[in-house]
Amino acid sequence: MPVSDDLLRATDPLVAGWIDRELNRQRSHLELIASENFTSAAVMAAQGSVLTNKYAEGLPSKRYYGGCEFVDAVEQIAIDRAKALFGAAHANVQPHSGAQANAAVFLALLERGDKILGMDLSHGGHLTHGSPVNQSGIYFEALHYGVDPASHRIDFDQVRELAHAHRPKLIICGYSAYPRVIDFECFREIADEVGAYLLADIAHIAGLVVAGVHPNPIPHCDVVTTTTHKTLRGPRGGLILTRDEALGKRFDKAVFPGTQGGPLEHVIAAKAVAFGEALQPEFKTYAADVVANARALAERLTARGLTLVSGGTDNHLMLVDLRSVDLTGKQADLLMSDVNITTNKNTIPFDPQSPFVTSGLRLGSPAMTTRGLGTTEFGEIGEIIANRLTQPTDARVVADCLERVASLCTRFALYPHLGRVVAPVG
């Protein structure tokens, strides 16, 4: 049942109106934010179900509330499907987000003041990997590695040097803005050399992993965390996976009662549906298309003279180094917004600009691949982006970009089952 149906419009037209506006925005824009996607109608139906009414602290068959027999069944389906997808021995599907999943892992494995080693945020890491503004950098001694200045690929010599010099308790791999394949085996070697736990945060690439178009970290890492949206195309939420049952029990306790109370069983139901979709053969095709489309976009941008961090992409995202066109990320993001393309400014390695300005623009292919666009269309998107970035003051270019974006959005409709929505003005 769509959230913006006639019942909601009649009951609360103010909220319904803003939801309708958002639906129109999603339909009329090219969504190129690498961390966003479009869930299926079935996922949204599960999340909007009566399971939202049920408290269920604990785990299936080990609850603190009565009346949990049916949510137990749903949560167990989600657990079993997650394990099957990733080849894990243990899965906890309760984390409300990827950040919550990481917080639970830290609680389970670390003591306050322990050392952790993760990628520098400005090189493509994540806030929860030891940023000083996040609890991971407040309660733990955070060390950071980066990418090689020339290749912009992970500097494993630096990772090894830092690991041996500081002996961290936990090493983190997995990123929010790294366009290349991650060598989990090399990280495992380094972790073993210094006796560290190894965490892979695959929030961005989880869908690629389960489809076999990116290496699986499960055989090499002590614990894997991810979000369930992004390339997995599920609801917003988190997930913890491990091949070690003993560690799995520690993670369960760290989630509840360690960092959360009652799980969101309606969201867990939506996770179960999304995992079921990802187990289908069609999902492998989708993930392969995500990678192919990203490469098509990267190749067209490069052909038009734009510079990409590391020279291209192996996964679903890329970073445009805007210094060659004398723009900042903040400026480029606004230029894209003016022609109905949704992106985000992003720091690049060794960025001279502040995180509020940046020198980069992050682009991703998952959402528009879900809408059905292929390599030809992503090549056209590359042309639109290049025209806008290289001719930012030309009104004719703006008009042409808007026309081409509108044509693509019309040809590849989003949520046609929701029908035509006319959002109110004002």
From Swiss-Prot:
Entry's EC annotation: 2.1.2.1
Modification type N6-(pyridoxal phosphate)lysine: residues: 230
Q: State the Pfam families in the record.
A: SHMT
The reaction(s) annotated as catalysed by this protein in its Swiss-Prot or TrEMBL entry are:
(6R)-5,10-methylene-5,6,7,8-tetrahydrofolate + glycine + H2O = (6S)-5,6,7,8-tetrahydrofolate + L-serine
Q: Which UniProt keywords apply?
A: Amino-acid biosynthesis, Cytoplasm, One-carbon metabolism, Pyridoxal phosphate, Transferase
Q: What does this protein do?
A: Catalyzes the reversible interconversion of serine and glycine with tetrahydrofolate (THF) serving as the one-carbon carrier. This reaction serves as the major source of one-carbon groups required for the biosynthesis of purines, thymidylate, methionine, and other important biomolecules. Also exhibits THF-independent aldolase activity toward beta-hydroxyamino acids, producing glycine and aldehydes, via a retro-aldol mechanism.
For this entry, the protein name equals Serine hydroxymethyltransferase
Q: Which organism is it from?
A: Gloeobacter violaceus (strain ATCC 29082 / PCC 7421)
